[in-house]
């Protein structure tokens, strides 16, 4: 299972791929959310609001298991608080 840092920018994945969100911030939970009306690229949650919470780092980074949907395309999402690398983020599913 691949690790994806919540504040990283663009990344690639394979349809249906399992991965783990990783949050290195020791002060804030990370919130992954839908970018406007763009399609949601993850299998959970299955209904709005499309948000995921990755816990903050305590003794080790916060993590959350996740999975990409089965439709190849370029998708956009927002992760906060990750202002230094900007939003929206991009995942390309092949």
Tell what function each PLM region has.
Residues 29-42:
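Short, surface-exposed beta-strand/strand-loop-strand elements in extracellular ectodomains
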Residues 1-6, 45, 51, 55-56:
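Right-handed parallel beta-helix/beta-solenoid
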Residues 1-19:
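N-terminal edge beta-strand
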Residues 22-25:
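Asparagine-centered strand-capping/turn motif at beta-strand->loop junctions
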Residues 17, 27-31, 73:
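Short beta-strand/loop motifs in extracellular/secreted proteins, especially
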Residues 1-3, 29, 88-90:
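Low-complexity, intrinsically disordered short peptide segments enriched in small/polar/basic residues
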Residues 48-94:
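Extracellular/periplasmic metallocenter environments
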């Amino acid at each position: 299972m691949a690790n994806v840092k919540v504040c990283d920018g663009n990344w690639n994945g394979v349809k249906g791929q399992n991965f783990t969100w990783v949050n290195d911030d020791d002060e804030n939970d990370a919130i992954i959310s839908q970018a406007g009306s763009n399609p949601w690229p993850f299998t959970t949650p299955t209904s709005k609001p499309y948000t995921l919470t990755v816990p903050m780092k305590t003794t080790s980074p916060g993590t959350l298991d996740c999975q990409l949907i089965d439709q190849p395309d370029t998708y956009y999402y927002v992760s906060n608080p990750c202002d230094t690398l900007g939003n929206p983020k991009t995942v390309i599913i092949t």
